[in-house]
Amino acid sequence: MEISGRKALVLGGTSGIGLATASQLAGDGASVVAASRDPGKALDGLTSGIELHACDVLDRDALSGLFSDQAPFDILVCAATGGARAAGPFLEMELDAYQGSFAKLWGYTNSVRLGVQHMTEKGVIVLISGAPARKTKPGQVALSSVGGAVEAFCRALAPELAPRRINVVSPGIIDTPMFGSLGEERTNKLEGATAGHPIPRAGTADEVAQGVLFTICNDLFRQI
């Protein structure tokens, strides 16, 4: 799919990977709508050509209204986290916190279920997951469970959506606002998390966004 001239909706598009993706889509000539619960977060890093909207992916009425107002569109990127994920040993974890981690899955579920009917016939959907879906460490039970569910959801749904396409981009450790505010603690967290990697640094939101755009553009992925 050529991006120039297309219309794209990026949910969770005002911070981190979502904002980087929205910016690159706009830079390549797409008309972009970026939505999140707090669109004001994007103002400092906003690229021209991006329209901001307030929308919570867990609010189905608001989401339906957004899709209806913006229809038809060609590209849907789901990068909204749905909130924090629980971390730490499972046997010490509050079960409500573990259950709450699945807000990301429900946000994606709402977005695809309500959005696909407003997309063009050969539209493309990209979901953002994460490496713990396939390779996990102690303390990542929630991350692994949610990511695995997102990826299974995508695989099962792909045949139903054809000729529209749905794919997952699943990055490793990425330096985004989810790691907290700037400072030594943030730096230490990122260095510790990537110390054993062949390339011992965190990835960037822009690097993940490049992968998202590659997935959108490469029609070979209709066969995957």
What are these regions (language model features)?
Residues K7, T14-S15:
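Conserved glycine-rich cofactor-binding loop
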Residues T14, A22-S23:
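N-terminal Rossmann NAD(P)H-binding glycine-rich loop of SDR-like oxidoreductase domains
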Residues L46-D61:
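Rossmann-fold cofactor-recognition segment
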Residues V77, V126-I128, I166-V169, F179:
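Hydrophobic structural elements of the Rossmann-like NAD(P)H-binding subdomain
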Residues V77-A87:
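Conserved NAD(P)H cofactor-binding loop of Rossmann-fold oxidoreductase domains
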Residues P89-S111, V124-A162, I173-I174:
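Catalytic loop of short-chain dehydrogenase/reductase
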Residues I174-G196:
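A glycine/serine/threonine-rich, flexible loop-to-helix segment
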Residues R201-I224:
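C-terminal substrate-recognition "lid" of short-chain dehydrogenase/reductases
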